[in-house]
Amino acid sequence: MVKRNVHLTKLQSGYLFPEINRRKNEFLKKHPSAQLINLGIGDTTQPIPLYISEAMQNFAKQLASEKTYRGYGTEQGSILLREAIAEQYYQGKIDPQEVFVSDGSKCDVGRLQILFGSDATIAVQNPTYPAYVDTGVINGQASFFQTSTKQYQRITYMSCLPENNFFPDLANLPKTDLIYFCSPNNPTGSAATNEQLRELVQFAKKRQSIIIFDAAYASFVRSSHIPRSIYEIEGAKEVAIEVGSFSKMIGFTGVRLGWSVVPKQLRFEDGHSVQQDWERIVCTFFNGASNIAQAGGLAALQKEGLQAIDELSSYYMKNSNILKKAFEECGYKVYGGENVPYLWVHFPQLTSWEAFEILLKQSQLVSVPGSGFGSAGEGFLRFSAFGKQSDITVALPRIKHALLKIKPTVY
């Protein structure tokens, strides 16, 4: 028989969200009439704006005609969409040839691991989006999991806590080849300032590292001092790859469309172009994003589409403001929720799973345990504001009922 991939054996038994679903379904079996409200997984709930969905519909209709049918597109993506991303999203700071359209930023995160190989060392924020770690493990960039620390050997974990404003102490970090950094951040809801990102870019230059910058939630940024892209920082093109996503921006979580930016200036240790190798990987592993999805993405970056993006972002951020106020009124410390619709709530007397179970059983609310994002997430829950406002309104009295019962001690 064929031996199992040894790297897959290193993965922990349950990915975070399947475990949440298991506990949720177990609760529903015991309480079939319960009306659960999901404030956990960050899936969108508002429909794709009509202007954008009509663009996809019109493209799909063209596929039914011999005159207008189109098959394979280019692996790198439609040049019209690449130009629109470069112009509208990056204000011309990025060359369209540096943009690679994909089926989502999560897929790009996995393929980027292949670009750098199993010998590459990686650093991740702690807490962090699980895909950065798990794709690294699968690709052989980690050793075995240590139960005592709840961390993988060979991976550097950058502690991001309220005490350091969710920005790591870079001076005390060892050199790694890759630095994964997400801002605005999932799960903590924090967003790095211009000053912090300048420090990160300078650190990467000094250590000769490459930053993988996840900007999936950039469309929600409201503060003028918060960059939407790493390329707003001088010198970032020399040390950073950025991934972006249409998923939360226009409700494309089920459509699947994203992009990566690999600047021409980015080089390997031997001077070879990173972009050239990335293009080879894209062309080898990927046949290009759906033409229909790309038609929607192109529409989203026109005047009417950009207005729809702003309206959608405002809708979810209003939810975030409502939820944040409710938690704070009950005496809880709440982080995030200002530049991304995620709230990071501290439960100082409980473990993350204990807090999860209390809210599930007492208030029929589903959240995400912070410990699932890393050891630094213990004692926190992540709440998503991507729900419907009607559900948020119904959830408020339930939240207050449960929280007041477990009201925290003075911080």
UniProtKB/Swiss-Prot annotation:
<dbReference type="Pfam" id="PF00155">
    <property type="entry name" value="Aminotran_1_2"/>
</dbReference>
<feature type="binding site">
    <location>
        <position position="42"/>
    </location>
    <ligand>
        <name>substrate</name>
    </ligand>
</feature>
<keyword id="KW-0663">Pyridoxal phosphate</keyword>
<dbReference type="InterPro" id="IPR004839">
    <property type="entry name" value="Aminotransferase_I/II_large"/>
</dbReference>
<dbReference type="GO" id="GO:0030170">
    <property type="term" value="F:pyridoxal phosphate binding"/>
</dbReference>
<protein>
    <recommendedName>
        <fullName>LL-diaminopimelate aminotransferase</fullName>
        <ecNumber>2.6.1.83</ecNumber>
    </recommendedName>
</protein>
<feature type="binding site">
    <location>
        <position position="186"/>
    </location>
    <ligand>
        <name>substrate</name>
    </ligand>
</feature>
<comment type="function">
    <text>Involved in the synthesis of meso-diaminopimelate (m-DAP or DL-DAP), required for both lysine and peptidoglycan biosynthesis. Catalyzes the direct conversion of tetrahydrodipicolinate to LL-diaminopimelate. Is also able to use meso-diaminopimelate, lysine or ornithine as substrates.</text>
</comment>
<comment type="pathway">
    <text>Amino-acid biosynthesis; L-lysine biosynthesis via DAP pathway; LL-2,6-diaminopimelate from (S)-tetrahydrodipicolinate (aminotransferase route): step 1/1.</text>
</comment>
<dbReference type="InterPro" id="IPR015422">
    <property type="entry name" value="PyrdxlP-dep_Trfase_small"/>
</dbReference>
<feature type="modified residue" description="N6-(pyridoxal phosphate)lysine">
    <location>
        <position position="248"/>
    </location>
</feature>
<comment type="subunit">
    <text>Homodimer.</text>
</comment>
<feature type="binding site">
    <location>
        <position position="106"/>
    </location>
    <ligand>
        <name>substrate</name>
    </ligand>
</feature>
<feature type="binding site">
    <location>
        <position position="186"/>
    </location>
    <ligand>
        <name>pyridoxal 5'-phosphate</name>
    </ligand>
</feature>
<feature type="binding site">
    <location>
        <position position="217"/>
    </location>
    <ligand>
        <name>pyridoxal 5'-phosphate</name>
    </ligand>
</feature>
<feature type="binding site">
    <location>
        <position position="129"/>
    </location>
    <ligand>
        <name>substrate</name>
    </ligand>
</feature>
<feature type="binding site">
    <location>
        <position position="287"/>
    </location>
    <ligand>
        <name>pyridoxal 5'-phosphate</name>
    </ligand>
</feature>
<feature type="binding site">
    <location>
        <position position="382"/>
    </location>
    <ligand>
        <name>substrate</name>
    </ligand>
</feature>
<dbReference type="GO" id="GO:0010285">
    <property type="term" value="F:L,L-diaminopimelate aminotransferase activity"/>
</dbReference>
<comment type="similarity">
    <text>Belongs to the class-I pyridoxal-phosphate-dependent aminotransferase family. LL-diaminopimelate aminotransferase subfamily.</text>
</comment>
<dbReference type="InterPro" id="IPR019942">
    <property type="entry name" value="DapL/ALD1"/>
</dbReference>
<feature type="binding site">
    <location>
        <begin position="245"/>
        <end position="247"/>
    </location>
    <ligand>
        <name>pyridoxal 5'-phosphate</name>
    </ligand>
</feature>
<keyword id="KW-0032">Aminotransferase</keyword>
<feature type="binding site">
    <location>
        <begin position="105"/>
        <end position="106"/>
    </location>
    <ligand>
        <name>pyridoxal 5'-phosphate</name>
    </ligand>
</feature>
<dbReference type="InterPro" id="IPR015424">
    <property type="entry name" value="PyrdxlP-dep_Trfase"/>
</dbReference>
<feature type="binding site">
    <location>
        <position position="287"/>
    </location>
    <ligand>
        <name>substrate</name>
    </ligand>
</feature>
<dbReference type="InterPro" id="IPR015421">
    <property type="entry name" value="PyrdxlP-dep_Trfase_major"/>
</dbReference>
<keyword id="KW-0808">Transferase</keyword>
<feature type="binding site">
    <location>
        <position position="72"/>
    </location>
    <ligand>
        <name>pyridoxal 5'-phosphate</name>
    </ligand>
</feature>
<feature type="binding site">
    <location>
        <position position="256"/>
    </location>
    <ligand>
        <name>pyridoxal 5'-phosphate</name>
    </ligand>
</feature>
<feature type="binding site">
    <location>
        <position position="129"/>
    </location>
    <ligand>
        <name>pyridoxal 5'-phosphate</name>
    </ligand>
</feature>
<feature type="binding site">
    <location>
        <position position="15"/>
    </location>
    <ligand>
        <name>substrate</name>
    </ligand>
</feature>
<dbReference type="GO" id="GO:0033362">
    <property type="term" value="P:lysine biosynthetic process via diaminopimelate, diaminopimelate-aminotransferase pathway"/>
</dbReference>
